[in-house]
Amino acid sequence: MKTYLDLLEKVMTKGEVKKDRTNTGTISYFGTQSRYDLREGFPLLTTKKMAWKAICHELLWFLKGDTNIKYLVDHNVNIWNEWPYEAFKKSNDFKGESLQDFVEKIKTDNQFAQQYGKLGPVYGKQWRDFNGVDQIEWVINEIKTNPFSRRLIVSAWNPGEIKEMALPPCHSFFQFFVNEKYEISLQLYQRSGDLFLGVPFNIASYSLLLLMVAQVTGLKPAEFIHTIGDTHIYSNHLEQVKIQLQREPKKLPKVTLNPDIKNIFDFRFEDISLENYEHHDPIKGKVAV
């Protein structure tokens, strides 16, 4: 995925040093766009090993309309744990538990999970119930009946509920486009992109969503277009980025879906198959909360 490496290089060389909410510090570049052609392979990063299982389960979690981390931790997906843990630490019930203790309690104590595993009305809530509108159901029906519409939009940005969210949506707005060949593309607008940790995850997640929507609407997947506002590299990821830029991308893998699935809400992890994924070693980095 040279396209992604070019984006890293651009931000490293043309970005500006900027303070941020987390007090970590970033190099930021405002306004970027990258295109990934799914006809040439699935855009899962090869210059470091990606957590494919986590990517799939998070997307399925969004599609369920779920906003509690219990489903994720039950499947050993730990990408959202820090935010509810930070909220738990401010509660009267906090007795010095570690993050690991917190996650174990989410797994084993349903009542605790219901109280402290909540993230507020984040992505799943907005996708499936934006002020009473199931946007995923609506957009799929619209694609089927009016594929050339310019209104094939789903928004996770709900100003009236932002303050109730553990984290306001970074990937906040996406739109589908169907051409005369009945090929479908998806463009995501992401207000804020953590280029080392988050963005590769987002590329794969929305590309997978595009494959799913294409299948259930009877269309052919074409491009994922990724538009990012504040495109940044955290200062504690700079060395990891330099390592990644030295690596040669490998051939892109292939993703196939169970062809029997005709309703997007019926997909399960077992219906998604990643094939021929060749990759370099993982590169770890700390998430900024």
From Swiss-Prot:
It is found in: Cytoplasm. One of its GO terms (biological process) is dTMP biosynthetic process. Keywords: Cytoplasm, Methyltransferase, Nucleotide biosynthesis, Transferase. It catalyses: dUMP + (6R)-5,10-methylene-5,6,7,8-tetrahydrofolate = 7,8-dihydrofolate + dTMP. Pathway: Pyrimidine metabolism; dTTP biosynthesis. DUMP binds at residues 21, 150-151, 191-194, 202, 232-234. The active site is at 170 (nucleophile). (6R)-5,10-methylene-5,6,7,8-tetrahydrofolate binds at residues 194, 288. Gene3D superfamilies: Thymidylate synthase/dCMP hydroxymethylase domain (3.30.572.10). Transmembrane segments: none annotated. Catalyzes the reductive methylation of 2'-deoxyuridine-5'-monophosphate (dUMP) to 2'-deoxythymidine-5'-monophosphate (dTMP) while utilizing 5,10-methylenetetrahydrofolate (mTHF) as the methyl donor and reductant in the reaction, yielding dihydrofolate (DHF) as a by-product. This enzymatic reaction provides an intracellular de novo source of dTMP, an essential precursor for DNA biosynthesis. Homodimer. This is Thymidylate synthase. It comes from Mycoplasmoides gallisepticum (strain R(low / passage 15 / clone 2)) (Mycoplasma gallisepticum).
